[in-house]
Amino acid sequence: PELRAELESRGTRLPWRGHSDTEVLLEAIEAFGLRGALSKCHGMFALGLWDAKRRQLSLVRDRLGIKPLLYVQGSFGIAFASELRALYELPSLRPRLSLSTLSSFLRFGVVPGTECIVEGVRKVPPGAILCFDEAEAPADKEYFWRADDVAAAGMRQPFEGDDREAVDELERRIRRAVELRMRSDVPFGAFLSGGIDSSTVVAMMQAVGSEPVETFCIGNTSSGYDESAHAAAVARHLGCAHHTLVADPADMLALVPEVARYWDEPFADSSQIPTYLVSRLTRQHVTVALSGDGGD
């Protein structure tokens, strides 16, 4: 809403056709240029922009690389997608396992950085703009945001308040971030495990919202892995509309073939199965959900 209002305040009558983020982003790029528009974007996004005047394709990924964006170059030209399986539809693409990426996966448990498990496919780096000209030359790469730059700026100008002021400032920023992400035309909720990360997000959602937050948790019949009691206690304290699904290890093991179909690449995190279950539970009630992933 802020970016749309800023564009309208410039005095130019804009031919809005709807209320989509994409339409606002295109008008922002036209008004401020690509880098200027990106500086005004918050949260996760990935985009491909064709500049008809310059005959140039730009691929852009959000600051932390939350949204996936893959690309491949070949005799067909350049293809890009948010899912690897979409690239498999290219008739001339013959997927082959990348042995170097497989080595990285076995070492780290994830496919790191810009690597891809399929040979020849690459990922746009987080916070980067890749530009391709009409001759399909190798991409020029520039960054509109780097974590190292932000950390260095923080070192040059450190926070000067005391501990209490630091806590208050952190709370203000988390609250603002949550508030921005609660602007939705569809029902939303949150994953709640009872840990610090998700509990903080839900507490902020409850503070800024007018209705009880719909929260979702997966329980486990194996007590050593069950956090549902903690989640339920947090939900009661905050006044949430809480939902719990209890699964046993046999149920989770049976899901392995199904879950594997949803991942484009190998993924060694055992939490993928409960995450799949809580996502499926959540989808029965709401369309969008916040989580505490990455909060620590």
What are these regions (language model features)?
Residues 266:
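A short, conserved beta-strand element in the Rossmann-like catalytic core
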Residues 269:
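Substrate-binding/specificity loop regions of serine endopeptidase catalytic domains
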Residues 1-263, 275, 279:
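Cysteine-centered catalytic environments shared across enzyme families
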Residues 272:
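Short phosphate-binding loop-to-helix
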Residues 63, 277-296:
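Active-site adenylate/phosphate-handling loop in enzymes that bind or generate adenylated species
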